[in-house]
Curated annotation (Swiss-Prot):
Name of this chain's protein: Cytochrome c biogenesis ATP-binding export protein CcmA
PROSITE patterns: ABC_TRANSPORTER_1, ABC_TRANSPORTER_2, CCMA
A GO molecular-function annotation: ATP binding
Top-level lineage group: Bacteria
Species this protein is from: Shigella sonnei (strain Ss046)
């Protein structure tokens, strides 16, 4: 039994099948990239895995239990960052981290912002930051969260090369510590091919 399992997932949109019969099992320490052309259903699959959407058929299981039966405990173990940063634009960068991680002290939050490339931006309202900086505020949570499972939709959007490298290193560290990372990205990952498992939506089934 894996930590996260998809069984025979079917997803249809506007009378079109995005994917069907999609099954896979993820274990501790796996780093997974969902691949496929635009419109193949990558974001849709991520939303199914977070429990935000339901498949037309099939099911997603966490530690052997259907998501709808373990929703609370699952979400305690999940960090989801989608296309939109999901941050409070009227709050400062530091206030956002305190909002999402109430048990994190100020020093930890400041260090997370520094790791995300936002040292010195902690007291600036998010609505005054650029799109890339707002993205970094959301991604700073990667240095604070205790969640086992990270699901990230295009995390490198509007992030410069140094930022991408730093985020990639953080993901590698998380998987080395037994966490799971699932992401979509159009950018090549600067890590050994052996570290990345790819699940393609151009095919209907994945092992």
């Amino acid at each position: 039994m894996g930590m996260l399992e998809a069984r025979e997932l079917l997803c249809e949109r506007d009378e079109r099948t995005l994917f069907s019969g999609l099954s896979f099992t993820l274990n501790a320490g796996e780093w997974v990239q969902i691949t496929g052309s635009n419109g193949a259903g990558k974001t849709t699959l991520l939303r199914l895995l977070t429990g935000l959407s339901r498949p037309d058929a099939g099911e997603v299981l966490w530690q052997g239990q259907p998501l709808h039966q373990v929703r609370d405990s699952y979400h305690q173990n999940l960090l989801w960052i989608g296309h939109q940063p999901g941050i409070k634009t009227r709050l400062t960068a530091l206030e956002n981290l305190h909002f999402y991680h109430r048990d994190g002290d100020t020093a930890q939050c400041l260090e997370a912002l520094a790791q995300a490339g936002l040292a010195g931006f902690d007291d600036i309202p998010v609505n005054q930051l650029s799109a890339g900086q707002q993205r970094r505020v959301a991604l700073a949570r990667l240095w604070l969260t205790r969640a086992t499972l990270w699901i990230l939709d295009e995390p490198f959007t509007a992030i410069d090369v140094n930022g991408v490298d730093r985020l990639t290193q953080r993901m590698a560290q998380h998987t080395e510590q037994g966490g799971i990372v699932i992401l979509t990205t159009h950018q090549p990952l600067n890590v050994a091919e052996s570290k990345i498992r790819r699940i393609s939506l151009t095919q209907t089934r994945a092992a």
